[in-house]
A protein has these predicted regions:
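N-terminal leader/targeting segments and the immediately adjacent pre-domain N-terminus
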Residues: 10-15, 32-136, 164, 193, ...
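Bacterial N-terminal signal peptides
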Residues: 24-31
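Active-site SXXK
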Residues: 124, 141-167, 191, 253-257, ...
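Short, charged, amphipathic alpha-helices and their helix-cap/turn boundaries
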Residues: 125-130, 169-173, 207-238, 263-282
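A short acidic/small-residue loop/turn micro-motif
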Residues: 132-136, 140, 391-393
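Active-site helix/loop module of the DD-peptidase/beta-lactamase fold
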Residues: 142, 161-199, 203, 232, ...
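Active-site-proximal alpha-helical segments within enzyme catalytic domains
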Residues: 249-256, 296-319, 373-390
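Active-site Gly/Thr loop motif
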Residues: 279-284, 331-384
Length: 414
């Protein structure tokens, strides 16, 4: 007897569905064999202390190296083939840059910004690779909000695969748990632009902020707690009229990915990018509960080189094996400033456009995370820079300007 998985679909529609079902089965089998998530008992440092910036330097580094212990975490499986990163003919030994009336060099940047890992890829080749603070090539380092840009990319992949029809679809089409609440009139595009109009306070260090209340909900490790909190928030403005940075919004974006693909964020990332891109190590991604919904706003843990490989994928406009994994031009759209409520905002689809004050950054954009995490993409210079750091506070630490350093690197390699 033959099993017919999708008798109501044409063959070209059926094959992708069969592949997704097969992949989901393989992921489940791997989870049963190897452990698809990290147990709650493995958690150590309280995430609230992390957000408060109340950690000694050594404890902070140890925590960022084992970010999967902060929450239950799914494993993002790599494939069997590793993509080599060749060494560039032109290497960076040092670089000079100026901020105000003071001059700095590479060594100042590494030391003063508490950099654990720095990778520079020019034309797909390694121009600089450095590890500090005890980190090394196999160290998986916390992405924090750089994961938002990964989630954005997965939405692009789901759109390309026809699993999402349009960015103008309401998020509730893919996330039924949000129906009947403040997100009823919010589109996927609104969420990607952080322009839902939902009231939100992002203050990391304030226990009464929405950011911290969402953290408390996630710390309960109860499935559905995050979406329940988001659903009941009040409205501050009409959708699409005001920009407001909102990490909770990206958990909604992650839920859209999971609802559209019927896979976890980790499984869809593995299927779409991590395996075919030739990553050298499994990654991890936070979930709100063991085996539960992935956190679209934070929580990827990956090696320096694998973040770099992801950056090269972005630089290629999302092409893998001559196929667009995301819609053509997706990253140009995702990485440029958008107009919200008639005003230009320096934010794209969960990516940060670089400030235009230095022409070397023209068309460049980055993924950015608290404590000094950066994935800088400069298409015109064919340049990717990854910075993994352990700054003392989530934001506001006195450090050297990253954009000035990136500009100096770009000029040194022209």
């Amino acid at each position: 007897m033959a099993f017919v998985l999708c008798p109501d679909l044409q063959r070209e529609q059926c094959i992708p569905k069969m592949r997704r079902l097969l992949f989901a089965y393989l992921v489940l089998a791997a989870a049963c064999t190897f452990g698809g998530h990290y147990a709650e008992s493995q958690q150590s440092t309280d995430i609230r202390r992390v957000l408060d910036g109340r950690m000694l330097p050594g404890e902070e580094v140890a925590t960022f190296e084992r970010s999967e212990t902060l929450y239950p975490s799914d494993v993002v499986r790599r494939g069997s083939v590793i993509r080599a990163l060749p060494v560039a003919d032109k290497r960076i030994e040092s670089v000079l840059f100026q901020i105000g009336d003071k001059r700095y060099d590479l060594f100042d940047y590494l030391a003063l910004n508490r950099v654990a890992g720095l990778l520079v890829l020019k034309d797909g080749k390694v121009a600089l690779e450095d590890y500090e603070l005890g980190a090394g090539p196999r160290t998986r380092w916390a992405s924090f909000s750089m994961a938002k840009s990964v989630t954005s990319t997965l939405i692009g992949a789901a759109l390309q695969d026809g699993l999402i029809d349009s960015l103008d679809d309401p998020v509730t089409r893919y996330v039924p748990a949000l129906r009947g609440g403040v997100y009823d009139s919010v589109s996927i595009r609104n969420v990607l632009e952080m322009a839902s109009g939902v009231r939100w306070d992002e203050t990391y260090t304030d226990p009464n902020s929405d950011c911290r209340k969402l953290t408390d909900a996630q710390m309960s490790h109860q499935g559905g707690a995050s979406l329940a909190y988001m659903k009941d928030l009040p409205r501050a403005a009409p959708p699409g009229s005001v920009w407001n940075y909102n990490s909770g919004e990206t958990n909604v974006a992650g839920a859209v990915v999971e609802g559209a693909t019927h896979l976890s964020l980790a499984a869809f990332l593995s299927q779409t990018l991590w395996s075919p891109l030739g990553m050298e190590r499994d990654a991890t991604w936070w979930t709100e509960s063991p085996g539960g919904m992935g956190m679209g706003g934070a929580g990827v843990g990956a090696t320096l080189r694998d973040y770099g490989r992801f950056g090269l994928f972005v630089l290629s406009d999302g092409v893998i094996a001559d196929r667009h994994t995301v819609p053509e031009g997706w990253f140009q759209e995702a990485g440029r400033p958008h107009r919200i409520g008639g005003k230009s905002v320096d934010y794209g689809y969960l990516w940060w456009p670089m400030p235009p004050r230095d022409p070397i950054h023209a068309g460049a954009f980055e993924a950015r995370g608290i404590f000094g995490q950066h994935l800088y993409i400069n298409p015109s210079q064919k340049l990717v820079i990854v910075v993994l750091s352990a700054r003392p506070k989530p934001t506001g630490s006195t450090v050297l300007d990253d954009t000035a350093f990136f500009a100096a690197v770009a000029r040194a390699l022209r």
